[in-house]
Curated annotation (Swiss-Prot):
It comes from Geobacillus kaustophilus (strain HTA426). It holds the Pfam family GATase. GO terms for cellular component: cytoplasm. The gene is hisH. CDD domains: GATase1_IGP_Synthase. InterPro entries: Class_I_gatase-like, GATASE, Imidazole-glycPsynth_HisH. Keywords: Amino-acid biosynthesis, Cytoplasm, Glutamine amidotransferase, Histidine biosynthesis, Hydrolase, Lyase. One of its GO terms (biological process) is L-histidine biosynthetic process. This is Imidazole glycerol phosphate synthase subunit HisH. The active site is at residues 79, 186, 188. IGPS catalyzes the conversion of PRFAR and glutamine to IGP, AICAR and glutamate. The HisH subunit catalyzes the hydrolysis of glutamine to glutamate and ammonia as part of the synthesis of IGP and AICAR. The resulting ammonia molecule is channeled to the active site of HisF. One of its GO terms (molecular function) is imidazoleglycerol-phosphate synthase activity.
């Protein structure tokens, strides 16, 4: 069973429907005791980094997530959920994240180095470029996936970047270290490529994808 962490800021419906399509049992909950029963966790997220961390800290879910990861429970952060895995964000003023991966979250400049303006948020389909092998990407093609975001991660350690995309700058699109994974894009809205990544994560969490 996969636990989708409900803290009031996730794209819960589309993630839960994607798991249903994969035939994967899940629980959608903000209750720590319920989530403790899950073999893997998904942290979705849409909205403000500062608001999300405030809720996670106030509800005790931030401490729960850190403890679960320390105990080896796989975790997948999606979109804002991926950004929350890192040390801090500059959105609405400096805010500490979960600190599970080193790095900080910054806003797209909106202007290229040559002075050309471009649209922020980044919204649309971009191709993945793989950098490192991972069980999360096993059998996945370097296809196009769907992004909606105004901020991106500058990693403290490039080794956590499993795949990137390009939108004026190099955007870490898939990250991972140990049992912690993240996608900046929405795998549940990214067609066959996204569903393959979600299916691999379910395999990692349930023990059929660790080989």
């Amino acid at each position: 069973m996969i636990g989708i962490i409900d803290y009031g800021m996730g794209n819960l419906y589309s993630v839960s429907k994607a798991l249903e399509r994969l035939g994967c049992p899940y629980v959608l909950s903000g209750d720590k005791e319920e989530l403790e029963q899950a073999r893997g966790l998904i942290l979705p997220g849409v909205g403000s980094f500062r608001d999300a961390m405030h809720i996670l800290n106030e509800t005790g879910l931030a401490a729960f997530i850190r403890s679960a990861v320390e105990n080896g429970t796989p975790l997948l952060g999606i979109c804002l959920g991926m950004q929350l895995l890192f040390d801090e964000s500059e959105e609405n003023g400096p805010t500490k994240g979960l600190g599970l991966l080193r790095g900080r979250v910054v806003r797209f400049p909106g202007v290229t180095k040559t002075g050309e303006p471009y649209k922020v948020p980044h919204m649309g389909w971009n191709r993945l470029r793989f950098h490192r092998p991972s069980p999360l990407l096993r059998g996945v093609e370097e296809g196009h996936v769907y992004f909606v975001h105004s901020y991106y991660v500058i990693p403290g350690d490039e080794d956590v970047v499993l795949a990137s995309s390009e939108y004026d700058v190099d955007v870490p699109a898939v990250v991972g270290r140990g049992c912690v994974f993240g996608t900046q894009f929405h795998p549940e809205k990214s067609g066959a490529v996204g569903m393959s990544i979600l299916n691999n994560y379910v395999g990692i969490a349930t023990g059929r994808g660790n080989g």
